[in-house]
A protein has these predicted regions:
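Positively charged n-region of N-terminal signal peptides that target proteins for export
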Residues: 1-4
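N-terminal small/polar-rich segments of proteins
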Residues: 23-101, 105-108, 132-172
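Generic low-complexity segments that are intrinsically disordered, proline-rich and/or Lys/Arg-biased
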Residues: 13, 127-128
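Compositionally biased, intrinsically disordered/low-complexity regions enriched for serine, proline
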Residues: 9, 100, 123-124
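Bacterial N-terminal signal peptides
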Residues: 8-17
Length: 172
């Protein structure tokens, strides 16, 4: 009889425990958010142009600053004509920060004879790197300069040299 009494007391106890587990569950509805911002765009507004020059006997460099200043080293003689730094109009989210990644060396080629020159030492305003610029009001102008390595007259005969380069602008 004691066994039956003990079992009859334990059964409701186990039933109560299983009910407690069911009653311990809870659900809640939560929210999730996302905000789509304006795409970051870049438009070239001025092409990088080292202008007209003569390499003379041993060549050297033509340096174009992001601000548009032009100087030469070595025996390179600068002559009059159009020259300018590159510029890009960047648009995107209001007051967002962005990064600038400049190319390493780029080769430009003579359209008549396939002779080449190298463009190196790229510079930008604002300076390249992470968090380089801020789109105050949703836009900014970035200026680019570089150094053109010029060989001798044999290495770089007369003609127009051209090429392309890639600059990456990205949100931080």
């Amino acid at each position: 009889m004691k066994k039956i009494l003990l079992i009859s007391l334990l059964i409701p106890l186990f039933m109560g425990v299983s009910e407690i587990r069911v009653q311990a569950q809870s659900s809640v509805t939560a929210q999730v958010f996302a905000e789509v911002i304006a795409a970051l765009t870049a438009t070239e507004t001025s092409q990088l142009n080292f202008g007209r020059f003569s390499p003379e006997t041993s060549g050297g460099d033509v340096l174009m600053t992001p601000q548009g200043g032009r100087t030469s080293n070595g025996t390179v003689i600068l002559v009059s004509g159009t020259h300018n730094s590159a510029s890009f109009y960047i648009t995107g989210d209001y007051n967002a920060t962005y990064s600038i990644s400049l190319p390493t060396a780029v080769v430009i080629t003579n359209l008549n004879n396939s002779k080449t020159m190298q463009v190196t030492n790229w510079k930008s305003v604002p300076p390249a790197g992470v968090g380089a610029g801020t789109l105050r009001g949703g836009s900014e102008i970035v200026s680019i300069g570089a150094t053109l390595k010029v060989g001798t007259v044999y290495d770089n005969p007369t003609g127009i040299y051209t090429g392309t380069y890639a600059i990456t602008f990205s949100y931080n």
